[in-house]
Amino acid sequence: MTEELRLIQPNSREDANLSPVSKIEIYSFFDPFSKECFKLSAILSKLRIEYKQYISIRHILNPSLRVLTKCQAQSTSDLDNIALAYKAAELQGRIRAERFIHLVQNEIIPKRDIITESMVNSCISNAGLDYEVFKEDLNSSCLKESLQVDLHIAREMEIEEAPSLVFFNEDVHEEGLKVEGLYPYHIYTYIINELIGSTIEKELPPSLEDYIQQQQLVTKEELLTIYEWPEKLMNKELKKLALQQKIEKLKSPDGKFWKAKN
């Protein structure tokens, strides 16, 4: 475990001067090319469900020189520079931006593909983004300014690797708790419980159909993490919903995404 994780122990509340809070803000720094970051996104989806009244999550593409250089090296234009593309997607809302980056990651991580304009165009469409607005936003001056803001935030929080999560309570005088790397789900729930400092009533996930309708686009890995079902049972339930014409499997990328049919 990292030094940050070791700060939280069963009897550490008094030492850390932690008092009960009602809301935690989590900054999630990710590398779009990282398999660990892709796995963490499913864990964060589960946290959002169970602790939705206690946490808010802000995703930030890690603006390190290494990540931005890789984004630039793999691009032929601003459209397929994933750092700029993600910022443009964000201007159309957090949910659509997250769908967009999940689609891109599912293309480039399992198959180790190079990002192309056609790939990005497909992901824009499947994420429900407005293509013309997206292109306009790519040329907006506020886009690179927004990247500079992310860079400032990352430096202030001393982010050195991705994935990294930084947990903040409501006390502006308290430093954030940084957790670098990928850990089992129960580690993150333990941190949330320690920071809240009072009894937490976790929410149960909605029905599988309702969750897919809410999110519009999901990965099977995300569903397996959230529902903790055997994969055989999950496949059966997904097939049942597909036969009922309530969801459909995306032909690309790799059929690992399921989309609600409206």
Curated annotation (Swiss-Prot):
InterPro entries, A to Z: Adapter_SpxH, Thioredoxin-like_sf
State if Cytoplasm is listed as a keyword. Answer: yes
Q: Which GO terms describe its cellular component?
A: cytoplasm
**Keywords (A to Z) from UniProt:** Cytoplasm
Checking Pfam families in the record gives: Thioredoxin_5
Q: What does this protein do?
A: Adapter protein required for efficient degradation of Spx by ClpXP under non-stress conditions. Interaction with Spx stabilizes Spx and exposes the C-terminus of Spx for recognition and proteolysis by ClpXP.
Known partners and oligomeric status: Interacts with Spx.
What is this protein identified as?
ClpXP adapter protein SpxH
The source organism is: Staphylococcus saprophyticus subsp. saprophyticus (strain ATCC 15305 / DSM 20229 / NCIMB 8711 / NCTC 7292 / S-41)
